[in-house]
Amino acid sequence: MYLQELQLQQFRNYPTAKLTFGQGINVLLGENAQGKTNLLEAIYVLALTRSHRTANDHDLVNWQAKTAKVSGRVVKAAGAVPLELTFSRQGKRARVNHLEQARLSQYVGQLNVILFAPEDLAIVKGAPTVRRRFMDMEFGQMNPRYLYNLSQYRTLLKQRNRYLKDLQHKQNKDLLFLSVLSDQLAAFGAEIIAQRLAMLQKLEHWAQAIHGEISQQREELTFHYATQVADDQLTDVPTITAALSALYAKQQDKELYQGTTLVGPHRDDLHFQVNGKNVQTFGSQGQQRTTALSVKLAEIDLMKEETGEYPVLLLDDVLSELDDARQTHLLTAIQDKVQTFITTTSLSGITRQLIKDPTIFHVAEGTVVADAVDSDDPAASKED
């Protein structure tokens, strides 16, 4: 899978842009605040219908416009697929092969991307919400059923929390409807937990091999999914469902007092351990970075295993955060395998021997010009 072309209309600081990319490494070169990250964001949005930088879609629209459009052409083993997203005050519309999609969940998965930015180091050392979002975004791309379960769960969670708030102000509390919501939430929550466990087991397999190579077999990386459901109950969906229902009943008085749901996958966490110790708490900065790099590279192999296609890799100013050894491992791992987009202010910090025939894009004040350095790729012709 690779992104052949990208078109922008009134997206961020780009009134208009049309770019054709190489199948290998594409370097977005320019000073800070010129629009390099905006281009990566556009690719990310084209894949997932949402930004990794803002929760407000209005931020994506050029301040002089009312509507923004991101479109592209994705080439897969089965052929080329045109994609299009339109953002306006009325919401967003998604098209695949020029056909509007009734639900965004039907759209996600047409273009798979993996983003690695400096803030992704927070996967290891950040708050639990960062790791939950990581699981939801990545597993949702690979598995439409996961995305569906997550959507249903979030809808029910909002409804249940709203009802818990309402019950705080009532003398006679109708707990029957709360019980119905709890049962429904437990069912979808169990599906999510079971799917997370299955995907994490596969991701751990790939990450362990990569982490072992980087650490020269001195360290072993393991994952631990932290949930209030007891380990011996994490066997199958019905057992997890029953366990969640029991936890809701146990926590009912506390939830009524606080007016929020205290149990479920929205409260779970993922712990990374090196040689049996939690990297977040006891790991050095080097171990934390090696863990983050191992996990991101493992995503590439897992996505290929799950979807049959390699994803597009987005490296947003992350090479400057890696030492020479980790940078070498990263660039060697993706060479000739994954279409990659790299943002940087200078090529001097990149080991050029590890970048084969890159397509270079010069970015300045929302204008992009492409040329080639030692490349015969037709995508390297100059283009505004």
Swiss-Prot record:
<dbReference type="GO" id="GO:0000731">
    <property type="term" value="P:DNA synthesis involved in DNA repair"/>
</dbReference>
<keyword id="KW-0963">Cytoplasm</keyword>
<dbReference type="InterPro" id="IPR018078">
    <property type="entry name" value="DNA-binding_RecF_CS"/>
</dbReference>
<dbReference type="GO" id="GO:0006260">
    <property type="term" value="P:DNA replication"/>
</dbReference>
<keyword id="KW-0234">DNA repair</keyword>
<comment type="similarity">
    <text>Belongs to the RecF family.</text>
</comment>
<protein>
    <recommendedName>
        <fullName>DNA replication and repair protein RecF</fullName>
    </recommendedName>
</protein>
<dbReference type="InterPro" id="IPR003395">
    <property type="entry name" value="RecF/RecN/SMC_N"/>
</dbReference>
<keyword id="KW-0235">DNA replication</keyword>
<dbReference type="GO" id="GO:0006302">
    <property type="term" value="P:double-strand break repair"/>
</dbReference>
<keyword id="KW-0547">Nucleotide-binding</keyword>
<dbReference type="GO" id="GO:0005524">
    <property type="term" value="F:ATP binding"/>
</dbReference>
<dbReference type="GO" id="GO:0003697">
    <property type="term" value="F:single-stranded DNA binding"/>
</dbReference>
<feature type="binding site">
    <location>
        <begin position="30"/>
        <end position="37"/>
    </location>
    <ligand>
        <name>ATP</name>
    </ligand>
</feature>
<keyword id="KW-0067">ATP-binding</keyword>
<keyword id="KW-0227">DNA damage</keyword>
<keyword id="KW-0238">DNA-binding</keyword>
<dbReference type="GO" id="GO:0005737">
    <property type="term" value="C:cytoplasm"/>
</dbReference>
<dbReference type="InterPro" id="IPR001238">
    <property type="entry name" value="DNA-binding_RecF"/>
</dbReference>
<keyword id="KW-0742">SOS response</keyword>
<dbReference type="InterPro" id="IPR027417">
    <property type="entry name" value="P-loop_NTPase"/>
</dbReference>
<dbReference type="Pfam" id="PF02463">
    <property type="entry name" value="SMC_N"/>
</dbReference>
<dbReference type="GO" id="GO:0009432">
    <property type="term" value="P:SOS response"/>
</dbReference>
<comment type="function">
    <text>The RecF protein is involved in DNA metabolism; it is required for DNA replication and normal SOS inducibility. RecF binds preferentially to single-stranded, linear DNA. It also seems to bind ATP.</text>
</comment>
<dbReference type="InterPro" id="IPR042174">
    <property type="entry name" value="RecF_2"/>
</dbReference>
